[in-house]
Amino acid sequence: MFSCCFPTSRGCCFRNGGSESLFRQCRRRLIPHPRRLWPFVRRRTQVPQDSPGQALAGQATPEIPSGLPLHIVLVQEEIREPMEAQTHAPGPYADIAALAAPAVEPKPAWEEPPPERALEVEGAPAKDQPSQELPEIMAPTVATGLNAGAENVAGERSGREGVTSTAPASRSHAAPSPGHGGKHGGGDQGIQTGLLYLAGERLLSFAGTTALLLQGLFIVLILVGYISVKVMLKSIKTRLGRRVPAAPPALRRNLLLQAWKCVCNWASRLFAPNVLPRTGS
């Protein structure tokens, strides 16, 4: 008897235990050629020559690699050699023989069942395998000196108290928990921060626009003032020109000569020596 590992793509895959013919077919395929399981098995060659298990030295033993979903299944091998030597003394594999054959067999990865058999296998586990129901958990009984009737009344009261106690619990579930409230509060705080940022941005843009408008208005006022002053000066000049008649060009030259002569006389008088007045003897 040796153990064999059947790796499958979907992990451990079981079939109905009633298909004995398929089980024998798989056993005949695997036992004569143990080298097919080379990545997953190894041979035990260190077997004493005088031990009764020498006939099983060429069998393969499983070696489960890490990271592969495997299921170990015990397969019984038919040994054609006479077993007289093994009947006298139990060998090292006697404890394995005591184990019962598995009730279910693995589904080989290289063989697909026919559609009819697949339908039977899909419907079989619900009928063949008994459903294991969990034992009903009972409350610990306390030894009291009351009779059976008093104990029944006490049990009914405790049941009513349990029903009434579940109502506040359901109401508490309906109320928002502090964790959810904190999440909603954080969301409201984020929304408020975004609104404040948007309001500040709009306020800055409004202030910049107002500054530009004031600057343009100031420039317009300066231009209007300059134009108005220029118009006023021009009107004053026109009024003064109407009152004083303009002299002809010849008279202007004479006026200039007379003004020059006056300036020269004033300068000669200014720089002339002081003449002392004569005094009588």
UniProtKB/Swiss-Prot annotation:
It is a single-pass membrane protein. Residues 107-131, 150-187 are annotated as: Disordered. One of its GO terms (cellular component) is membrane. Residues 165-178 have a biased composition (Low complexity). Residues 108-120 have a biased composition (Basic and acidic residues). The chain crosses the membrane at residues 207-227. Keywords: Membrane, Transmembrane, Transmembrane helix. The keyword Transmembrane helix applies. It is found in: Membrane. This is CMT1A duplicated region transcript 15 protein-like protein. It comes from Homo sapiens (Human).
